[in-house]
A protein has these predicted regions:
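Active-site ligand-binding patch in enzyme domains
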Residues: 1-58, 67-70, 125-128
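Conserved histidine-centered catalytic loops in small-molecule metabolism enzymes
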Residues: 93-129
């Protein structure tokens, strides 16, 4: 939440789970809520991943729209991707999904009307299990 525009009454901020809010406005900490102020003059993804590394966070799930996901993919900041494709839904318009680079298909599973494709980043294939 770069400019802290999200309403504070969202469940995201209820402090039931440890939450980190990366932003350009403030640095503050509560029980399970950390506001981490980023340097607006630096690469945001580099700064976020460095901060997470320093906090010893070893796994991150990135959920977002195509622009957010494409940013992580473009910087090579992904190890695994799960792509869910609904085989029965037809949309006339919409946003294009991100384009994955260096992907290796590991497996596919069918779940109801969905196909779940598991990809790994080909750059790291030696360490994948």
């Amino acid at each position: 939440d770069k400019n802290l525009k999200l309403p504070v009454n969202l469940k995201l901020f209820d402090e039931k789970e440890k939450t980190i809010v990366f932003n350009n406005i403030k640095q503050a900490e509560a029980t399970n809520l950390l506001y981490y102020k980023l340097d607006a003059n630096r690469n945001i993804l580099t700064e976020i991943t460095a901060a997470l590394y320093n906090m010893q966070v070893q796994s991150v799930i990135v959920e977002g729209g195509p622009r957010v996901l494409q940013s992580f993919i473009g910087e090579g900041l992904w190890d695994e991707a799960r792509v869910v494709t609904n085989t029965s839904m037809v949309l006339g318009k919409g946003l294009a999904s991100p384009k994955i680079n260096n992907e290796i298909l590991i497996k596919e599973e069918k779940f109801a009307n969905d196909i779940i494709s598991y990809f790994m980043n080909g750059t790291y294939k030696q360490g994948y299990k």
